[in-house]
């Protein structure tokens, strides 16, 4: 990515998000809040759009490196530039999926991007092989959150996610694993930042 002068910031357009998606006519997920003001264009004293700081648009490189190390032998090593490359790719991927999900919300005149929108976007953009395992994880997560609310009645920060994932979104019985073309069952692995263990889904925890 290119830098503007000596600034360490990166413009949102470099993430593959067009100006239309930053404006109020579309809906985007903001890193800090979802108020109406944060969804509009911001102007600084020079009249230019507010830039995102790199630490706001990138996942911690330590987490990225940890995921990468899971895919290589224990004796393998990963160069710094490879980690940074994947770190940027992750942000590009998030922007790519979210923009498609945002378009669906705009067409349906909704302002909240939910789990079903993300799954729809992934399927539309050609990531069909990921949709079924993610449906499984989201249903398990929703059931676990309902169980917690039934026991303690506590309201958590993830309540919005569990409420958005309605029963209509998961009407079909989900498999415990994927069935490959040769009839063999394939285990499902889901990467998550969730602190809790959900039965039936193998998890890799991030710090």
Curated annotation (Swiss-Prot):
Residues 53-142 are annotated as: B domain. Transmembrane segments: none annotated. Residues 59-65 bind DNA. There is a cross-link at residue 140 (Glycyl lysine isopeptide (Lys-Gly) (interchain with G-Cter in ubiquitin)). Disulfide bonds: none annotated. Pfam families: CBFD_NFYB_HMF. Residues 86-97 are annotated as: Subunit association domain (SAD). It is found in: Nucleus. Residues 143-207 are annotated as: C domain. Keywords: Activator, DNA-binding, Isopeptide bond, Nucleus, Transcription, Transcription regulation, Ubl conjugation. The keyword Transcription applies. GO terms for biological process: regulation of transcription by RNA polymerase II. GO terms for molecular function: DNA-binding transcription activator activity, RNA polymerase II-specific; DNA-binding transcription factor activity, RNA polymerase II-specific; protein heterodimerization activity; sequence-specific DNA binding. Monoubiquitination at Lys-140 plays an important role in transcriptional activation by allowing the deposition of histone H3 methylations as well as histone H2B monoubiquitination at 'Lys-121'. It comes from the Eukaryota. Residues 39-52 have a biased composition (Basic and acidic residues). Residues 1-52 are annotated as: A domain. SUPFAM superfamilies: Histone-fold. Component of the sequence-specific heterotrimeric transcription factor (NF-Y) which specifically recognizes a 5'-CCAAT-3' box motif found in the promoters of its target genes. NF-Y can function as both an activator and a repressor, depending on its interacting cofactors. Heterotrimeric transcription factor composed of three components, NF-YA, NF-YB and NF-YC. NF-YB and NF-YC must interact and dimerize for NF-YA association and DNA binding. Interacts with C1QBP. Can be divided into 3 domains: the weakly conserved A domain, the highly conserved B domain thought to be involved in subunit interaction and DNA binding, and the Glu-rich C domain. Belongs to the NFYB/HAP3 subunit family. This is Nuclear transcription factor Y subunit beta. It comes from Bos taurus. The gene is NFYB.
């Amino acid at each position: 990515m290119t830098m503007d002068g000596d600034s360490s910031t990166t413009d949102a357009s470099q993430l593959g998000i067009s100006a239309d998606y930053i404006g109020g006519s579309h809906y985007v997920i903001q890193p800090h809040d979802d108020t109406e003001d944060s969804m509009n264009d911001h102007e600084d004293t020079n009249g230019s759009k507010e830039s995102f700081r790199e630490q706001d648009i990138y996942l911690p490189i330590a987490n990225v490196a940890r995921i990468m190390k899971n895919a290589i032998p224990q004796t393998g090593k990963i160069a710094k530039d490879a980690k940074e490359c994947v770190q940027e790719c992750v942000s590009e991927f998030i922007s790519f999926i979210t923009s498609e999900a945002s378009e669906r919300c705009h067409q349906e005149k909704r302002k909240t991007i939910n789990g079903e929108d993300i799954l729809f976007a992934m399927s539309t953009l050609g990531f069909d092989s990921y949709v079924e395992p993610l449906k499984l994880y989201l249903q398990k997560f929703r059931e676990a959150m309902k169980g917690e609310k039934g026991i303690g009645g506590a309201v958590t920060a993830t309540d919005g996610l569990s409420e958005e994932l309605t029963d209509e979104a998961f009407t079909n019985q989900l498999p415990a694993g994927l069935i490959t073309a040769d009839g063999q069952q394939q285990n499902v692995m889901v990467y998550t930042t969730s602190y809790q263990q959900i039965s039936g889904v193998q998890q890799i925890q991030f710090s």
